């Protein structure tokens, strides 16, 4: 299992909400073309201007396809809203489930 995590800090809660509404409308359509991929978005009440997105992939090819879709469809919005962005990509090394 592979993952990619984006943590974006926006100047305001409103900009974060706007960005998440863009993600909701775009990804609900775009993700259909890449089966077996999981997208989750998280926010907390304590820091509502921070959006965390976690992608999970079963293989490197799916990850590559999503990264291209991000470049083609999402980067223009992050360039306009200009959040501070941190990202992480990696392979799962441990997994526990109860």
Where would I find each of the regions flagged by the language model?
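Short S/T/G/P-rich N-terminal loop/turn motif that feeds into the first structured element of a domain
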Residues: 1-72, 79, 85-98
């Amino acid at each position: 299992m592979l993952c990619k995590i984006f943590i974006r800090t926006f100047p305001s809660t409103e900009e974060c909400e706007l960005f998440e509404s863009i993600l909701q409308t775009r990804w609900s359509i775009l993700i259909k073309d890449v089966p077996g991929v999981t997208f989750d978005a998280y926010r907390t009440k304590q820091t509502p201007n921070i959006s965390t997105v976690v992608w999970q992939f079963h293989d490197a090819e799916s990850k590559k396809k999503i990264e291209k879709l991000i470049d083609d469809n999402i980067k223009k919005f992050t360039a306009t809203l200009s959040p501070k962005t941190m990202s992480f990509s990696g392979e799962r090394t441990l997994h526990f489930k109860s």
